[in-house]
């Protein structure tokens, strides 16, 4: 089954779409009894990741340079008994995102996905996008600290489903590790590359 561009965009959390830039090395798709590879999604412009589509509607996003793999599972999909090693599962819908990377906000806005963001690493007055600023001023999005000093209590209370960081997070690996210890997947977006 070949997905249309609209279906592909709907199937992925908006955070995964901020990956663009350098060429990604080809990777072998994961195949298990539960995950049956269907096809590699052809990417015309984004080259910093690969997307492998599976028969059950799952998509495996691989970011080779960061050695990161996210398996995006469709809403309502059964829990997998076996997850390939090194793969982080994101169950749709991904909600209560902690968006630290300001450059990614525009993509969320264009995908009409602002409602999936609950937390920001930028204060309201720091936003250059009116929609983000207004969402923070009205309390729809809360400030949860910058990348190097997040408010872990607020992030946990919000039941954060994903932290979208920029590459600065790699300068404070202890923060990334702590978020992951709390069970929060961390995506280091690379749109500035």
Where are these regions (language model features)?
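N-terminal export leaders
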Residues: 5-9
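Charged, glycine-enriched surface loops/patches
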Residues: 172-193
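Short edge beta-strands and adjacent beta->alpha junctions
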Residues: 28, 46-51
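N-terminal module-boundary/linker segments of secreted carbohydrate-active enzymes
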Residues: 38-45
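A short, structured surface patch at a secondary-structure boundary
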Residues: 57-156, 162-169, 184
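Sec-dependent N-terminal signal peptides
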Residues: 11-16
């Amino acid at each position: 089954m070949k997905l249309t561009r609209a279906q592909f965009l709907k199937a992925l959390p908006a955070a995964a779409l901020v990956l663009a830039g350098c060429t990604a090395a080809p990777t072998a798709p994961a195949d298990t009894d539960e995950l049956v590879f269907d096809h590699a999604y052809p990417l015309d412009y984004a080259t910093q990741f690969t997307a492998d589509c599976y028969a059950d509607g799952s998509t495996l996003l691989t970011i080779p340079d960061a050695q990161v793999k996210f398996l995006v599972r469709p809403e309502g999909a059964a829990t997998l008994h076996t997850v390939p090693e090194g793969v982080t599962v994101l169950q749709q819908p991904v909600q209560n995102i902690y968006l630290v990377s300001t450059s990614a906000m525009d993509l969320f806005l264009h995908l009409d996905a602002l409602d999936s963001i609950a937390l920001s690493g930028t204060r309201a007055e720091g936003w250059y996008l009116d929609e983000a600023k207004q969402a923070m001023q009205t309390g729809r999005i809360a400030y949860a600290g910058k990348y190097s000093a997040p408010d872990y209590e607020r992030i946990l209370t919000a039941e954060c489903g994903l932290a979208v960081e920029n590459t600065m997070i790699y300068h404070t690996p202890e923060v990334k590790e702590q978020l992951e210890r709390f069970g929060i997947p961390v995506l280091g977006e690379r749109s500035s590359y």
